[in-house]
Amino acid sequence: MSTPSDQHNTLSAGKCPFHQGNSNQTAGGGTSSRDWWPNQLRVELLAQHSNRTNPLGDDFNYRKAFSELDYAALKADLKALLTDSQPWWPADWGSYTGLFIRMAWHSAGTYRSADGRGGAGRGQQRFAPLNSWPDNVSLDKARRLLWPVKQKYGQKISWADLFILAGNVALENSGFRTFGFGAGREDVWEPDMDVNWGDEKNWLEHRHPESLAQAPLGATEMGLIYVNPEGPNHSGDPASAAPAIRATFGNMGMNDEETVALIAGGHTLGKTHGAAAANHVGVDPEAAPIEAQGLGWHSSFGSGAGADAITSGLEVTWTQTPTQWSNYFFENLFKYEWVQTRSPAGAIQFEAVDAPEIIPDPFDPSKKRKPTMLVTDLTLRFDPEFEKISRRFLNDPQAFNEAFARAWYKLTHRDMGPKARYIGPEVPKEDLIWQDPLPAAIYQPTQADIDSLKAEIASAGLTVSELISVAWASASTFRGGDKRGGANGARLALAPQRDWDVNASAARALATLEAIQRTANKASLADIIVLAGVVGVEQAAKAAGVEITVPFAPGRVDARQDQTDVALFEFLKPKADGFRNYRGVRSSTPTESLLIDKAQQLTLTAPELTVLVGGMRALGANYDASAHGVFTDRVGVLSTDFFVNLLDMRYEWKATDATAEVFEGRDRESGEVKYTATRADLVFGSNSVLRSFAEVYASQDAHEKFVKDFVAAWTKVMNLDRFDIQ
């Protein structure tokens, strides 16, 4: 017979999960749904950066806080910081100039024109993966050096703005005259999970330059900002690096002149660090132990800092005055003959074989070195087109200074959107084409004007579907990443947007609205287009038995064609727009994932996505006037029919062909085809999260709520680019 003691021992040996204290029951622990279903639709991307993660609360206004900042005092403190060398991370030549320029560059340099994501606008360098990228080694120290300044000024200056301003001050302190600085970057409080950094699983995997043109990636290797400084795949060949350089800088919207200026300007100051082999360097900040307090890459070589520092593994100092602006980069590039050598860490670099020792040692004034350069620096001499520009800058330092000032400004402000978002005393007056400039408003419609225009639009013979389609086509180009696109400017009427196939269904309505604008002669076409959507929604709601006034904020203006860079606006052409049941060039990305991507660009939540798709299907707003997803026999009525019929078990769905892109919904009893749908429709019944929202709107008590929610989400999209009223 067993005793209580025996029973206790048996339970202990079996490790009863209820009382042993070693079960991983912490929040978020254990196997997740994504472990079981790795291709699960990422609806959670639409919940990023909510107020629940913002410690500053709903009432915080960054623009107001910045207006109370002593800007001159801040810049003075940054200038003092540059030469306040800290023993835990000693400054090269007693100055953090190069370090802060690199921090600013790498903060901004993740931007990609293709999808507008990345860039400096959110202060993402604080978070993974960027805080631990191989190309960002030691920038954790730069951010810690900045902390006393950030701590002093608190929320009057965001981290995102501070990173860039610190780089500007570093340049100015070196004797360079910058083009200006615009603040207005608001911090977020968690990593951007929507950015596709690539599919590679290992750091520094090589990408062919041609592949970069087919994906919104900004670097030739996973974990780099731009290109491998040792040449493609560590080739050591300067000439072969030219395609990669053009591809990566081109993905940011930089031309050859801007590219040369940025490379040379960025390498006029500071140095790289490669005192010893990389095996001395510890884990990155995200992998570091808790006592490291967010710092990574601890080095076991010597002191691990100062003269013993290891970052890229390259040991290069470009110029004789690494803390003072000069034209020595180009002078050295063309004056000397360069031979391939290796750094103490074993990285491929070049040394000026016929040069005297003219480069000062960063910590021992009695020592000098020969000039050294990166493999990719020499590309500026050995690529024919880059060489022409480089020689011009060699012979005309002022042209170089002007080109770098403008290119640096573009680099660091590229993802900020229109100049209306810029704040601060150093914003340049000049409008630049990459800012998508708009003319000043010359007339503000009165309420009487608005009422008159609404009546004229309503009597113009346009259907609800046409009114909705033209307004959506105008507003839905907005991208939350770089704040480009949107209805303001009425660029729907300009090249290239007027010629996009996705906008073909808006052509008749656009022509009608242009005629109304010519007769009105006061209101902008941009306002009239949005007002057309207002009329359409109000008509559709009334037809559904709900009287509602759709909010409308006048004040938009009309851009000119010469204010519109056609090539840059081509990036705004949607690859897919599930709200209109549009999908362009086929890819391996599922249609429903592209729908989530589009909603994320429009800063929509999952409920907003759901109500908008359901409403637009009821209003017949498909780009090609197809019946896909139009689960109603009363098109143009703002009804919940889409949800009711999608969730109705009378229908079963089958793909029409092997692509499984289009489906037929058949009556289970008769076999009759009742509806057709795309993946962008059926996902609201198949995905468990989206279905939960669809069930709300399919309920019998949801009709009025649906109309109100649709109006709110619709108005949000129409005003996404109205930074003047936000």
From Swiss-Prot:
There is a cross-link at Y226-M252 (Tryptophyl-tyrosyl-methioninium (Tyr-Met) (with W-105)). Belongs to the peroxidase family. Peroxidase/catalase subfamily. There is a cross-link at W105-Y226 (Tryptophyl-tyrosyl-methioninium (Trp-Tyr) (with M-252)). Heme b binds at H267. Residues 1-34 are annotated as: Disordered. GO terms for cellular component: cytosol. Gene3D superfamilies: 1.10.520.10, Peroxidase, domain 2. The keyword Iron applies. Signal peptide: none annotated. The lineage of its organism: Bacteria, Pseudomonadati, Pseudomonadota, Gammaproteobacteria, Enterobacterales. HAMAP family: Catal_peroxid. It catalyses: H2O2 + AH2 = A + 2 H2O; 2 H2O2 = O2 + 2 H2O. Residues 1-12 have a biased composition (Polar residues). Its EC number is 1.11.1.21. The active site is at H106 (proton acceptor). It comes from Cronobacter sakazakii (strain ATCC BAA-894) (Enterobacter sakazakii). GO terms for biological process: cellular response to hydrogen peroxide; hydrogen peroxide catabolic process. Binds 1 heme b (iron(II)-protoporphyrin IX) group per dimer. It is an enzyme of class 1 (oxidoreductase). Formation of the three residue Trp-Tyr-Met cross-link is important for the catalase, but not the peroxidase activity of the enzyme. The gene is katG. This is Catalase-peroxidase. Homodimer or homotetramer.
